[in-house]
Amino acid sequence: MSALFSHAIRNEWAARNPITSVRTSAKRLSTPDILTASEFQALLLELSQRERVMVLMAAATGLRRGELIALRWRDVDLEEKLANVTHSVLHNVEGNTKTEASGKPVPLPTLVIDELKLWKLKSLYRSEADYLFPSIAKNGEQPIQPDMILKRHIRPALVRAGVKKRIGWHSFRHGLGTMLRQKGVDIKTAQELLRHANSRITLDIYQQAVTEEKRRAQDMAFNGFLEVGSTQHPSAPSEPD
């Protein structure tokens, strides 16, 4: 039952998990760790290309992990700098994202677009129907396992970077929200960028179009992560997963 409510919260169909009122451990109720600008930069420098693109996309867009790995090349418009988030993957099962906010186009910063173009050139799977981040072990027929990426690549990279925080995929989404607040972005624009669908969470109705105001706000917030220095560096190839 708790898992069902957790799934509903991840997709923002529910605001809270009532089961947690019975089990009130600090771990369940704590806010996820987020990275500072310098920590985020240090992490990027330790990641190989695939993982770096995944982290950049997660941090820039606030996509949930299931939405991130469900993306196919046909969902990304590299010219218009948009991602159409229409599906999500949970426990290897791909389904539609039916909420009002989740189906709206997501703006992509120029840096992310540049990294995606480079990744597409390198990836073995680059047709329109292919996943952006496919599992090599599954011959590209399934997306990569996000928890495996965390365990094998991102968390070891954090250790190498000297970052002692416990980071999960939701940390990047939470970090974007924090950076938006720190940069003084108005609540309506921030909620639209984070695509909160539940009225108890969003407090307002979303606009359909990706506006220039939202794009400027996203660029302002995301650039805050990159003020420390450049992300360009020689990358070792990722190991097949």
Locations of regions flagged by a protein language model:
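Basic, Lys/Arg- and aromatic-enriched nucleic-acid-binding interface segment
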Residues: 10-71, 79, 101-103, 111-112, ...
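Catalytic-site neighborhood detector that most strongly recognizes the C-terminal catalytic loop/helix
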Residues: 26, 34, 51, 89, ...
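Non-catalytic DNA-binding core/recognition domains of DNA-processing enzymes
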Residues: 1-7, 22, 108
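Short, basic (Lys/Arg/His-rich) helix/loop patches that form interaction surfaces
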Residues: 41-52, 61, 106, 120-131, ...
